[in-house]
């Protein structure tokens, strides 16, 4: 045997067998791994692994045979092992086409999955861009919310200031009207304020009180004048009545001294003289009473006109109070508009809450995508939610303040209406006085008409009596003159006393009515009167001009 053959048998063949054994072993390991890990059919990899193991067995048998170990046994085994290995590889080869198809399907599936992954990546990119847009929108809305927050704070400060002014003004108006309802017309509302509506309300209330004060002063002055004049007239009438009584007594004494003379002329002159004198004196007295009644009518007419002027002034006060009620109602409408603004702020807060909820949802989406925008969205959402909570709290506080202002405004309106009712009562009392003056005027006019008729009748009778008396004048001039004067003075004194009694009664009734009017007017306190019912004139600070 040549050296080359020996080298081949000694080195190359064993080395090739070793390489083959190692290769079959590696193929078996690879086939088993693919059988376990790959998605291809398991039967192919099972056959591949089995064939590789047979190849390892065949190679080892061949190596042992060449090494002289159990030569006869391995000589018999190597041939079948080789045939089996080739057969198994052949069988595995027939399944290669199916495996290739499966691999192609697997490749297509992976390509489809890769395409889906690309689409998902593109979708994720679009979602990222959309998230960035939403983030920009959120930042813009955050800026707008911050601006709205600042505006809300400024508006809240303005509303708080307005509410404070309204509360202070309502309190002052209430105190002033309460003082006026108690009779103190010197109280005034401070009209120095920056709010035009509040200043207008204060001005209207002050004008109303000034008008009422001026009217009450005028009525009080008129009442005082009427009372004084009535008392003076009553006193004068009393003096005249006493003087008339004295004159009547003197005349009776004179008449007693002329009885003898009247007895001599009793058949002719006595009755005629007495009749004529009585008629003349009655006519004169009737004219005097008519003049007095005319003067009294003028006084009563003037009193009635003054009382009617007082009613007109009270009507003006009532119109002013109605205007004040309308202004307070307008103030209540203004608080209603402020309440609408508070509701608008509450609605903005609710919308801001919805914005915070959307921001939280976007933050959750951004966080699930693994991006860093989730935390930013969460922070923005928390800030927006805090802003919404603060806005709702401010809106609630404003609503409570408005409710309190509306309650105080309603109380003020009620107090003004009570004062208006009291003014109505005063107007009714003055109207009763006017009616009383009217009745007095009518009675005096009727008395004047009756006295005028009596005076005319007496004038006619006096003319007839003078013609009769002239026929007996020459008989007893001195006696007739004395008797006539005595009888005339006596009759005149009696008639004058009766007339003065009636006038005194009328003056006393007028004085009583004037006292009643003055008592009612004294319930009010003005700058001119100073006090009402003798009370102190101390008024709350800032409530009087």
UniProtKB/Swiss-Prot annotation:
One of its GO terms (biological process) is signal transduction. Methylated by CheR. Residues 111-157, 521-545 are annotated as: Disordered. GO terms for molecular function: transmembrane signaling receptor activity. Gene3D superfamilies: Methyl-accepting chemotaxis protein. PROSITE patterns: CHEMOTAXIS_TRANSDUC_2, HAMP. It comes from the Archaea. It is found in: Cell membrane. The chain crosses the membrane at residues 10-30, 44-64, 80-100. Residues 123-157 have a biased composition (Basic and acidic residues). The keyword Cell membrane applies. InterPro entries: Chemotax_Me-accpt_rcpt, HAMP_dom, MCPsignal_dom. Keywords: Cell membrane, Chemotaxis, Membrane, Methylation, Transducer, Transmembrane, Transmembrane helix. Residues 527-539 have a biased composition (Low complexity). Its main location: membrane. Potentially involved in chemo- or phototactic signal transduction. Belongs to the methyl-accepting chemotaxis (MCP) protein family. This is Transducer protein Htr7. The gene is htr7.
């Amino acid at each position: 045997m040549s050296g080359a053959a020996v080298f081949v048998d000694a080195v190359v063949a064993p080395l090739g067998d070793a390489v083959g054994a190692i290769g079959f072993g590696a193929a078996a390991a690879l086939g088993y791994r693919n059988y376990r890990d790959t998605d291809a059919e398991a039967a192919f990899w099972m056959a591949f692994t089995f064939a590789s193991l047979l190849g390892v067995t065949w190679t080892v048998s061949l190596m042992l045979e060449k090494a002289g170990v159990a030569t006869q046994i391995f000589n018999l085994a190597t041939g079948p092992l080789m045939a089996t290995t080739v057969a198994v590889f052949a069988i595995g080869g027939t399944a290669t086409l199916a495996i290739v198809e499966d691999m192609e399907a697997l490749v297509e599936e992976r390509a489809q999955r890769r395409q889906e992954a690309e689409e998902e990546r593109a979708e994720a990119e679009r979602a990222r861009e959309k998230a960035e847009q939403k983030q920009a929108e959120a930042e813009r809305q955050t800026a707008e919310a911050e601006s709205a927050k600042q505006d809300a704070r400024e508006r809240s400060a303005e509303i708080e200031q307005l509410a404070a002014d309204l509360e202070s003004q309502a309190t002052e108006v209430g105190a002033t009207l309460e003082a006026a309802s108690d009779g103190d017309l010197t109280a005034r509302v401070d009209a120095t304020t920056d709010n035009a509506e509040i200043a207008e309300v204060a001005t209207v209330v002050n004008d109303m009180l000034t008008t009422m004060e001026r009217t009450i002063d005028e009525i009080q002055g008129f009442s005082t004048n009427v009372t004084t004049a009535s008392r003076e007239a009553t006193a004068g009438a009393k003096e005249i009545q006493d003087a008339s009584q004295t004159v009547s007594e003197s005349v009776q004494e004179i008449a007693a001294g002329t009885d003898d003379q009247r007895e001599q002329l009793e058949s002719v002159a006595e009755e005629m003289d007495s009749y004529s004198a009585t008629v003349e004196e009655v006519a004169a007295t009737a004219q005097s009473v008519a003049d007095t009644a005319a003067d009294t009518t003028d006084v009563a007419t003037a009193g009635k006109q003054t009382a009617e002027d007082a009613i007109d002034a009270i009507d003006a006060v009532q119109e002013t109070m109605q205007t004040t009620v309308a202004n307070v109602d307008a103030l209540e409408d203004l608080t209603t508009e402020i309440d609408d603004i508070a509701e608008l702020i509450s609605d903005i807060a609710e919308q801001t809450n919805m914005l915070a909820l959307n921001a939280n949802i976007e933050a959750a989406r951004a966080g699930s995508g693994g991006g860093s925008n989730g935390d930013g969205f969460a922070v923005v959402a928390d800030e927006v939610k805090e802003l919404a909570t603060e806005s709702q709290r401010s809106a609630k506080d404003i609503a409570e303040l408005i409710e309190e202002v509306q309650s105080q405004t309603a109380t003020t309106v009620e107090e003004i209406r009570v004062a208006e009712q009291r003014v109505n009562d005063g107007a009714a009392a003055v109207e009763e006085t006017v009616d009383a003056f009217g009745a007095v005027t009518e009675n005096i006019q009727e008395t004047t008409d009756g006295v005028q008729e009596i005076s005319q009748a007496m004038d006619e009778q006096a003319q007839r009596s003078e013609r009769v008396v002239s026929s007996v004048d020459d008989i007893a001039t001195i006696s007739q003159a004395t008797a006539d004067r005595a009888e005339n003075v006596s009759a005149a004194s009696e008639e004058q006393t009766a007339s003065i009694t009636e006038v005194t009664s009328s003056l006393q009734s007028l004085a009583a009515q004037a006292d009643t009017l003055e008592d009612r007017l004294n319930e009010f306190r003005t700058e001119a009167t100073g006090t009402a019912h003798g009370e102190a004139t101390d008024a709350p600070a800032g409530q009087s001009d």
